[in-house]
UniProtKB/Swiss-Prot annotation:
One of its GO terms (biological process) is glutathione biosynthetic process. Its EC number is 6.3.2.2. Pathway: Sulfur metabolism; glutathione biosynthesis; glutathione from L-cysteine and L-glutamate: step 1/2. It is an enzyme of class 6 (ligase). This is Glutamate--cysteine ligase. The lineage of its organism: Bacteria, Pseudomonadati, Pseudomonadota, Gammaproteobacteria, Enterobacterales. PANTHER family: GLUTAMATE--CYSTEINE LIGASE. Belongs to the glutamate--cysteine ligase type 1 family. Type 1 subfamily. Keywords: ATP-binding, Glutathione biosynthesis, Ligase, Nucleotide-binding. One of its GO terms (cellular component) is cytosol. One of its GO terms (molecular function) is glutamate-cysteine ligase activity. Pfam families: Glu_cys_ligase. InterPro entries: Gln_synth/guanido_kin_cat_dom, Glu_cys_ligase, Glut_cys_ligase.
Length: 517
């Protein structure tokens, strides 16, 4: 069953200030599409600023794949309003284009039409585009156009002071990092609850497969939509962004030094498969290198330990310097029922669940045990809503119904919710528990259940198009609430100045820059 955390919950009830001041951030990806849903072939709109240097509006893999990044925030309402303001501003500046509201792309005629994100003529800009060229040549461009939401989360220092007895972040970095690794291990064990409740990619357009082999038993509608009747998140399946060559890297989440050493090993380990791609063709680079990972960010993971990097610092060097500062949750599909791709209920649920993961005991896990947890994720991803579906506990030695495990978990989450609500004198967190608990008795009320019902009636392309148009009208007509037009114009202008400055300060050739990095 789930770990017994009654003692930890009693401790939390006695130390409510330990969870006052949680910091959060959201990153939301979305494809720019035309009125008929096809991938936009236009460049990143100049009015939105430089994708290289803008603090809030950038691009991910493709020139048409927008990414919105909120600043760190300790207020849920303000965080979501800021994100919505970015959406409002972008909606007003996309002309007749709109933002695709689903994780899975639909109307992409050919991978050749997917232009890689462009970041200007500086070495760092060209490096970023070449990294994407490598991703395209390794995994195919289509897979890289799948969109998601990332949720960044950190517990306040007061939590670690009360729980672990640390004095400050610097002297306590070992204990704090160990605490975040415990959270991560619990996330691997129980994080399947996220795609169960919020997975929103139960179907794909048949064009997405394009002759690719799949052993998945898809059902097909008359309109050509492919779906699995009980699937929750095909984005998280092997059809989505996974890297099979990474599964034997032996990366574990038991302590910082071992984790970083394994990560550094992966970026130095040559790959026979990627060596066959080659480094150059007709004088043009094809990837940054031929190692298993070109850079650390290529590591696929449903959750990542993070620290803000300094200039010239790799993510792992930042972790070694200061320990884990926050974690990045990467298992959220785009929420099609929200104009901004994520809702307040989801944010509040993640707060509760991540606090639970930090409180619950989590024995160290070997690489094999981590692979074992993947079985539960796969079961939920492909057949999560199947009546009587079970998850395996203790590496598959015990099977328990999802509904039973989910309800036990929510009994704990409600106690965490009461602590958080007492601080705000509003029952927001408890309301989220009530709202989501229903999904364990009636899986059709989950995001994937609701969405698949809609898609079977109208087709997934039609659902995407009508939601995109509805949200375009809604967002472009709403006034800004926390940002101003002046702030947005200044951020855009400053980002272009910064890009020009970076370009003018380059001193070495791109070949030399690559060799040095």
């Amino acid at each position: 069953m789930i770990p017994d955390i009654s003692e930890a919950l009693s401790w939390l009830e006695k130390h409510p200030l330990a969870v006052k001041g949680i910091q959060r951030g959201i990153e939301r990806e979305t494809l720019r599409v035309t009125a008929n849903g096809h991938l936009a072939t236009t460049g990143h709109p100049e009015i939105l600023g430089s994708a290289l240097a803008h603090p809030w509006i950038t691009t991910d893999f493709a020139e048409a794949l927008l990414e919105f990044i909120t600043p760190v925030d300790n207020d849920v309402d303000h965080l979501l309003t800021f994100l919505r303001d970015i959406h409002r501003h972008v909606s007003r500046n996309l002309g007749d284009e709109r933002m695709w509201p689903l994780s899975m792309p639909c109307f992409i005629d050919s991978e050749q039409n997917i232009e890689l994100a462009q970041y200007g003529s500086s070495n760092i800009g060209r490096f970023k585009t070449l990294y994407r060229e490598g991703l395209k040549n390794r995994y195919g461009a289509l897979m890289q156009t799948i969109s998601g939401v990332h949720y960044n989360f950190s517990l306040p220092l007061s939590f670690w002071q009360a729980r672990e007895g640390v004095a400050d972040a610097e002297s306590g970095k070992k204990a704090i990092s160990a605490g975040y690794f415990r959270l991560i291990r619990n996330y691997y064990r129980f994080g399947w609850v996220i795609p169960y409740l919020f997975g929103a990619s139960p179907a794909i357009c048949s064009s997405f497969l394009k002759g690719r082999e799949t052993a998945l038993p898809f059902e097909r509608t008359e309109k050509g939509m492919l779906y699995l009747p009980y699937a929750t998140s095909l984005r998280l399946s092997d059809l989505g962004y996974t890297n099979k060559s990474q599964s034997n890297l032996g990366i574990t989440f038991n302590d910082l030094d071992t984790y970083v050493a394994a990560l550094k090993r992966a970026i130095k380990t040559p790959s026979e498969e990627y060596a066959q791609v080659g480094m150059k063709k007709d004088g043009r680079y094809l990837q940054l290198n031929t190692n298993v990972l070109q850079i650390e960010n290529e590591l696929y993971a449903p959750i990542r330990p993070k620290r803000v990097t300094r200039a010239g610092e790799t993510p792992s060097d930042a972790l070694l310097r200061g320990g884990i500062e926050y974690i990045e949750v990467r298992s959220l599909d785009i929420n099609p029922f929200s104009p901004t791709g994520v809702s307040e209920s989801q944010v509040r649920f993640l707060d509760l669940f991540l606090i639970w993961c930090a409180l619950a005991d989590a024995p160290e896990m070997s690489a094999d045990e981590l692979l074992c947890t993947r079985k539960n994720w796969n079961r939920v991803i492909l057949e999560g809503r199947k009546p009587g579906q079970t998850v395996g506990m203790r590496c598959e030695t015990i099977q328990q119904p999802i509904a039973e495990v989910g309800k036990s978990l929510f009994a704990d989450l409600r106690r965490v919710a009461e602590v958080l609500d007492a601080e705000n004198s509003q029952p927001h967190y408890q309301q989220v528990c009530d709202e989501l608990l229903v999904g364990f008795d009636d899986p059709e009320t989950t995001f994937s259940g609701r969405l698949l019902t809609l898609m079977k009636q109208e087709g997934n392309g039609s659902v995407g198009l009508s939601l995109a148009e509805e949200y375009r009208k809604m967002l472009s007509s709403e006034p800004l609430q926390v940002l101003t037009e002046e702030q947005l114009a200044a951020a855009s202008e400053h980002s272009w100045q910064r890009q020009r400055q970076i370009e003018s300060e380059d001193t070495m050739s791109f070949d030399d820059y690559l060799a040095a990095n």
